[in-house]
UniProtKB/Swiss-Prot annotation:
Cofactors that this protein relies on: [4Fe-4S] cluster
Reactions performed catalytically: [[Fe-S] cluster scaffold protein carrying a second [4Fe-4S](2+) cluster] + N(6)-octanoyl-L-lysyl-[protein] + 2 oxidized [2Fe-2S]-[ferredoxin] + 2 S-adenosyl-L-methionine + 4 H(+) = [[Fe-S] cluster scaffold protein] + N(6)-[(R)-dihydrolipoyl]-L-lysyl-[protein] + 4 Fe(3+) + 2 hydrogen sulfide + 2 5'-deoxyadenosine + 2 L-methionine + 2 reduced [2Fe-2S]-[ferredoxin]
GO cellular component: cytoplasm
Subcellular location: Cytoplasm
Name of the gene encoding the protein in the UniProt record: lipA
GO molecular function annotation: 4 iron, 4 sulfur cluster binding; lipoate synthase activity; metal ion binding
Pathway in which the depicted protein is active: Protein modification; protein lipoylation via endogenous pathway; protein N(6)-(lipoyl)lysine from octanoyl-[acyl-carrier-protein]: step 2/2
Organism: Legionella pneumophila (strain Corby)
NCBIfam families: lipA (TIGR00510), PRK05481.1 (NF004019), PRK12928.1 (NF009544)
Cofactor: record remark: Binds 2 [4Fe-4S] clusters per subunit. One cluster is coordinated with 3 cysteines and an exchangeable S-adenosyl-L-methionine.
Protein name, entry field: Lipoyl synthase
Family in the record: Belongs to the radical SAM superfamily. Lipoyl synthase family.
Amino acid sequence: MGKLIDIPIVVESGQKYKTSQGVTAIKDGIKSSGQDHERLPKPKWLRIVNHTTPAYSQVKEQVQKHRLATVCEEAKCPNISECWSHGTATIMLMGAVCTRACRFCSVDTGNPHGWLDAEEPENTAETVALMNLDYVVLTSVNRDDLPDGGANHYAKTIRAIKKRSPRTKVEALTPDFQGSERDVAVLLDSGVDVFAQNVETVERLTHPVRDNRAGYQQTLNVLAFAKKYRPDVLTKTSLMLGLGETDEEIIRTMDDLRTHHVDILTLGQYLQPTKNHLPIARYVTPETFSELRQIGLKKGFFEVASGPLVRSSYRADRVFKRDNLGLDV
């Protein structure tokens, strides 16, 4: 009798499957609709350049060794090769299954039923130390199944990083914790340097773009509370463009963000991750991104990173240092 060979099961986008923890999840977050919307042709100026360097391999090795999830992989970020080749990565905490199903996001969705990796805070801190990072971005899936939304897990991870690598700056791109100021305060007391939460889109499009449990005003309120509670911590948010918003709505959103004391803004082009996700309504030109950056700076943002391939944590270390000026993003 021949030797049995394990054949990996390929899960199609939109299909249900079970994770290694036994959690039922939907691949890429959105169920298959059976429809394939006509896609806008990609403009010539929107090109992703792949970088492969020894640093890329080192980051990948550390991520795999410590069983870390990264938003770079899970959200199919177009900048993964560039960022990893520069020795930086955005680490995704609390697993790779989100309790929400935003219609722009390709992270798998499901209910982890309270599962957490107790070793993750120390593993993450060890990885950051081994990579000798000056700046690290932590993000996570939404964990509405946890009483605190994962705030204490975040705080443990940040404290572990600061203990091993006291000079490392830590940015936390967090879920909204259902608007709980108590949970947000737990995270802010951990020693975090930048508190980020994404408003994602303009107010009019919030319902069709984001999960129903998210809210435009709720995100603004959380960001405002963070600044009031810890004025020394920079606050940050991100907008995707190309979902059907107008330039006037973008500028109005900037005004709302400044009213709620948000320091840093990133603007990037929405790219449809699978056929099951929201279609692209328009491609915003590099010239428009540049104009919007200047408008944002005039409104008083500490920094505005704006470009077709800009994502929430793209070049976050440079943005933190206000070293984004003149970059071709």
